[in-house]
């Protein structure tokens, strides 16, 4: 695995949907992407699609500390990590009384993974010259019916993001909170008990969304867009 002098980005949840588009568009702009996902079959496909000089797949659970640390050690061997995009997460849409412990554990994997990948990358970079973008949801900005556990997780992610901003204010570590609304991916398409098919056309295209996010994240301007709130059009 070689980065060939390219800027290095880590994208968690890179196999499908928004994560895939973020990885694809970064690679198109000349980045080397370390993609993290539990979908081994899809990860193998992406290594073939992008090539070893642009993409390295790491297959595992983002909330597994041993996996995180081993992966970061390998990635750091290539050079300084410039960008970490914590994108991985899983949904759980149910009425409040229908939730079980397994649903809570599933949602919390995203929060735990965000923390572990941030900590490990910060350590590897010596807490310098790093941008961390935490992709959450508009569910981190309000409470939604039938999303109580999901919202609780996203609010936790927002709290972590805000705390990182406070800790690294005035340094070369930049923290960005990303809050997108509904995206037209399997994340919602597989949840038609909650999201009606009639509303699906109003959800955001992941390629367009990734372009908007990266336009704000990756540029040569002497500024940082600290929060990116992106709502879908409801028509």
Named regions from a protein language model:
Residues 137:
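Residue(s) in the substrate-gating loop at a strand-loop-helix junction
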Residues 15-16:
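Conserved glycine-rich cofactor-binding loop
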Residues 73, 77, 101, 109-129, ...:
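Amphipathic alpha-helical dimer-interface segment in Rossmann-like NAD(P)H-dependent oxidoreductases
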Residues 29-45:
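Conserved glycine-rich Rossmann-like NAD(P)H-binding loop of the short-chain dehydrogenase/reductase
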Residues 69, 90-103, 146-149, 188:
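Conserved mid-core segment of classical short-chain dehydrogenase/reductases
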Residues 90, 97-116, 133, 157:
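Catalytic Tyr-X3-Lys loop
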Residues 118, 153-154:
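Active-site helix of classical SDR
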Residues 177, 197-235:
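C-terminal helical subdomain
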């Amino acid at each position: 695995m070689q980065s060939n002098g390219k800027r290095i980005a880590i994208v968690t949840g890179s196999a499908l949907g928004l994560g895939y588009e973020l990885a694809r568009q970064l690679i198109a702009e000349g980045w080397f992407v370390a993609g993290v996902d539990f979908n081994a079959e899809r990860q193998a496909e992406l290594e073939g699609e992008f090539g070893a000089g642009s993409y390295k797949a790491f297959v595992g659970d983002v909330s597994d500390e041993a996996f995180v640390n081993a992966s970061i050690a390998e990635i750091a061997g290539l050079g300084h990590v410039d960008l970490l995009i914590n994108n991985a997460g899983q949904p759980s849409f149910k009425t409040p009384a229908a939730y079980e412990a397994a649903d809570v554990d599933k949602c919390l994997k995203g929060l735990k993974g965000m923390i572990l990948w941030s900590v490990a990358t910060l350590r590897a970079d010596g807490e310098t010259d790093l941008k961390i973008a935490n992709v959450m949801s508009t569910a981190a900005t309000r409470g939604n019916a039938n999303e109580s556990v999901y919202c609780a997780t996203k609010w936790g992610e927002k709290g972590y993001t805000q705390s990182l901003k406070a800790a690294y204010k005035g340094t070369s570590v930049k923290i960005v909170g990303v809050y997108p609304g509904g995206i037209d991916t399997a994340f919602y398409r597989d949840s038609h008990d909650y999201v009606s098919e009639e509303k699906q056309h109003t959800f955001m295209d992941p390629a367009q969304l990734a372009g908007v996010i990266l336009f704000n994240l990756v540029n040569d301007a002497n500024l940082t867009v600290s929060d990116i709130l992106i709502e879908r059009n409801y028509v």
